[in-house]
């Protein structure tokens, strides 16, 4: 191409393609797997009280940890590659204030990864809470990994 030619613009292609909401997916969760709990006891009797996250407390997603303490893999969480250097946090769900909800569902496959991790989010007064806000409200308590 000579210097007088201008290349045709191309559709922007970011390094990651986030899942769009669809009939099958809502906010990166499989719609068929989404459950909502207004009771901590109802949630913990089904899934336990241990959660963790890869990322920073200003984010709002944590993942369920199995009763033996085994966390989901990076691929099951469908995290972007830059999260490989993000910190790891472990928590116990300690309480659920009145009018708060736990919303949980299975992560949909994305970024060429399998998905399948059970993601957990906390809603209070209709607002999605960050992990830092959950800690301030006493919903989440840090736990030791030993």
Residue ranges and their predicted role:
Residues 1-80:
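ADP-ribose/NAD+-binding catalytic cleft of ART/PARP-like enzymes
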